Amino acid sequence: MAFLKKSLFLVFFLGFVSLSICEEEKRETDEKENEQEDDREERSEEKRLLGMIPVAITAISALSKLG
């Protein structure tokens, strides 16, 4: 009976360790994906702002011609 208890404990322990490792890897993968998504959002915001520069220059030049 003691052998069976030790065997079950060993199986439980190894399963728990394996599960912990898998969860850690999943967490790291999710963090990397979130960082990549944040980088994409920042680049798209920069592109929008850079796209507004010609419009702003046109508006300023039009206002300077009026004044």
From Swiss-Prot:
Protein modification: In the synthetic mutant medusin-PT1a [T58K], the Leu-50 has been modified in a D-amino acid. In medusin-PT1a, there is an increase in antimicrobial activity, and an increase in hemolytic activity. It is more potent against S.aureus and gains activity against MRSA, E.faecalis, E.coli, P.aeruginosa and C.albicans. There is an important increase in both biofilm inhibition and biofilm eradication.
Tissue: Expressed by the skin glands.
Stated consequence of mutating P54K: In medusin-PT2; increase in antimicrobial activity against Gram-positive bacteria and fungi, and increase in hemolytic activity (is more potent against S.aureus and gains activity against MRSA, E.faecalis, and C.albicans
Propeptide boundaries: 23-48
Location of region: Disordered: 25-46
Acidic residues bias (residue ranges): 31-40
The protein, known as: Medusin-PT
Organism, as annotated: Phyllomedusa tarsius (Brownbelly leaf frog)
